[in-house]
Amino acid sequence: MAFDKDAIIASLKDATILDLADLVSAIEEEFNVSAAAPVAAAGAADGAAAAKSEFDVELTSAGTAKVKVIKAVREATGLGLKEAKDLVDNAPSVVKEGLSEDDANALKESLEATGASVTVK
């Protein structure tokens, strides 16, 4: 059985979007396939399996020694006094982003030593 590609392409050009959607559905049913792109599914699986390399340190609570926490935040971030105080007052807030795991854990330990509650995400 021979077919004329040009004739098929010409009839596809003349078809409406609804006709083309029906055609795709019919082809999926006839050949038991899906029109979904397999690349997208594989890409999502690769992203979930990849190890996390950047971490964010989030101050969840300043605790009772707020002044010590503000000083520690200033040292870690280089922020001014007002900015560091605002960050601590508005907890939960991100202290630093994009750190390596070791740096994030070191910052977490130094902030927790001042009495703050900290999470690494």
Curated annotation (Swiss-Prot):
Cystine pairs = none
Q: Please give the name of this protein.
A: Large ribosomal subunit protein bL12
- Provide the family line: Belongs to the bacterial ribosomal protein bL12 family.
MF-aspect GO terms:
mRNA binding; structural constituent of ribosome
Q: Which residues form a coiled coil?
A: none
**Which keywords belong to this entry?**
Ribonucleoprotein, Ribosomal protein
Per the record, GO CC terms? cytosolic large ribosomal subunit
Query: Subunit notes for this chain?
Result: Homodimer. Part of the ribosomal stalk of the 50S ribosomal subunit. Forms a multimeric L10(L12)X complex, where L10 forms an elongated spine to which 2 to 4 L12 dimers bind in a sequential fashion. Binds GTP-bound translation factors.
Enumerate the Pfam families for this protein: Ribosomal_L12, Ribosomal_L12_N
Q: Domain of life of the organism in this record?
A: Bacteria
GO biological processes? translation
Q: Which InterPro entries match?
A: Ribosomal_bL12, Ribosomal_bL12_C, Ribosomal_bL12_C/ClpS-like, Ribosomal_bL12_oligo, Ribosomal_bL12_oligo_N_sf
Lineage, highest ranks first: Bacteria, Bacillati, Bacillota, Bacilli, Lactobacillales
Residues annotated as signal peptide: none
What PANTHER family would the database entry show?
A: 39S RIBOSOMAL PROTEIN L12, LARGE RIBOSOMAL SUBUNIT PROTEIN BL12M
Q: What does this protein do?
A: Forms part of the ribosomal stalk which helps the ribosome interact with GTP-bound translation factors. Is thus essential for accurate translation.
